[in-house]
Amino acid sequence: MKQSGINGVKTLTLVVCAALASQAYAAVNYESANYIGSQPEGSVRFIIKYKDKSQSQQMMTNRSTTSVMNNNNITIAGFNAQFVRTMTIGAGIFAVPDLKTTKEAHLVMDTIASNPDVEYVEVDRWLRPFAAPNDPFYNDQWHYYSEYGVKADKVWDRGITGKGVTVAVVDTGIVNHPDLNANVIPGSGYDFIQEAEIAQDGDGRDSNPADAGDWHSNWACGKYPDPRYEKRNSSWHGSHVAGTIAAVTNNRIGVSGVAYDAKIVPVRVLGRCGGYNSDINEGMYWAAGGHIDGVPDNKHPAQVINMSLGGPGVCGSTEQTLINRATQLGATIIVAAGNDNIDAYGVTPASCDNILTVGATTSNGTRAYFSNHGSVVDISAPGAGITSTVDSGARYPSGPSYSLMDGTSMATPHVAGVAALVISAANSVNKEMTPAQVRDVLVRTVSSFNGTPDRRIGAGIVDADAAVNAVLDGNVVERPIDELKPQAEYRNPQIKLIRDYQMMFSEIKVNGRPGNTKFAVVKADIRHTDPSQLKLRLVSPKGYEYAVHYDNIKNKSSELITFPRDEQMNGYWRLKIVDTKRGVTGYTRGWSVAF
């Protein structure tokens, strides 16, 4: 396709509209379109990522082209579409306000994907906070000091309080509150909500991360008669989360924070009805210190990022890419599992890799009835009856207050706060910790549930005292693969088809290895047109799952996995492969496990 003589409108058509005769189809995340019926009417948008070095990608990243796009409408599969903006990863966002059904979304996605320049297309999903207000305020923070709390009080007694650590709260923003203000870095934060109607503060993206309120009227956020979309007052959700992490302590008022000397950077990504995945993930990446065009760089990059939010659907390419980049910048990302009592594998970003996914427990040490569960949940924390900082206004900010809330949203900041304590403890003895080390020590030092949970919600309850002890004792070193020498390797050479948008397992039976192991080395040889759409897990004989990170270039994986618990060696070990998008298939040429 030549560019010469193409005016603004034709250039836009070249970038978006498909060459229908082409057979080189891109990865289409059909699953991301399954839930558009639960979004506010007229809110459907698509994220389109073009292949690197393609003509379309070059035009997408060209500022003059995108400025032309912004002033023109186009048609895709008969639907009017408007260019919104270009993301930091080079993907374009397009709004299709008249689209209403999953079938229509699939038609649009197929049309886009038939362009040979397209790498993938997915819906810009709508995510929401994972909490709901409960009972009136009472000053009883059992979740810090009781048998099934996080045992933060024992760490405070040793002077470990989160000092020197920055935590980003990616949420609804934050309110003016005497129990928060001193721990919010002055002038920090940003409002990433682009749509003024969602932001409810009169404008789009700006440097003011204040929570303007997320109230909404009946059925503004979804269809009648779903009770989830009845009118609701503002939640002040981000302030409640921030208070659990780092409320000012020993000030004779209100509540305490888990890491009460840590500092908060508020990142506003949720407003009326929630927020777009694209805004949320760029806000998360910015919080870690990543650059976003048009936004001043964050002068206070966070070592810990709290994301008490989510929505239906498995982790997509866009969020996983930005999570990986944020992790590479040194941020430990803590995410809520969700509150629908379902398998969190079907929730995003809870199902992403390189994060810690958090379930919720009660004061009795049992699984909270609402907590999502499953193999992607890594750890749990108190999430029922949690008191923290909010505003007293029903719709708009009117003054400081306190409230009791339930949710995995409330459990997640407990883990984020303990992560800050762990990093602070490492700093106190001149140690540096990677995000992988922080995640490992948190999971490896958990306290026990009260009995076996009715559904799997991770290794146990986060334990600040045990985690900090592990750091101070030096028990956090990531051991290189050559220091852990497996005694034997077990192989399955079978060729197995990886079917389109399905799950497959390949088994290895281990005999003659009594005892337990703390690690395994996994090797896999997988051939696939688009390996980025695959999720790999090693499943132990006990049924615990561990992420296997896949080499997209060489189509092979060789990875050391350390376990947070002893795993028996004898029994059936399985490699689980999930194809998360439609359009292409592949196969495995065998795999092995060694310990």
From Swiss-Prot:
Secretion signal span? 1-21
| Keywords (A to Z) from UniProt | Hydrolase, Protease, Secreted, Serine protease, Signal, Zymogen
Q: Which domain of life is it from?
A: Bacteria
Q: Provide a Gene Ontology MF annotation, just one.
A: serine-type endopeptidase activity
GO terms under biological process: proteolysis
Q: Which family does it belong to?
A: Belongs to the peptidase S8 family.
PANTHER family the UniProt entry points to: CEREVISIN-RELATED, PEPTIDASE S8
Q: Name one GO cellular component term.
A: extracellular region
Q: Which CDD domains match?
A: Peptidases_S8_13
InterPro entries linked to this entry: P_dom, Peptidase_S8/S53_dom, Peptidase_S8/S53_dom_sf, Peptidase_S8_Asp-AS, Peptidase_S8_His-AS, Peptidase_S8_Ser-AS, Peptidase_S8_subtilisin-like, Peptidase_S8_subtilisin-rel
For this entry, the protein name equals: Extracellular subtilisin-like protease
Question: Which SUPFAM superfamilies did the record assign?
Answer: Subtilisin-like
PROSITE patterns attached to this UniProt entry: P_HOMO_B (PS51829), SUBTILASE (PS51892), SUBTILASE_ASP (PS00136), SUBTILASE_HIS (PS00137), SUBTILASE_SER (PS00138)
Limits of the P/Homo B domain: 484-595
Enumerate the subcellular locations listed in this protein's record, separating them with semicolons: Secreted
What residues make up the catalytic site? 171 (charge relay system), 237 (charge relay system), 409 (charge relay system)
Q: What class of enzyme is it?
A: hydrolase
The residues covered by the Peptidase S8 domain are 141-468
Q: Which residues form the propeptide?
A: 22-130
EC identifiers of the protein: 3.4.21.-
Give yes or no: UniProt keyword Hydrolase. yes
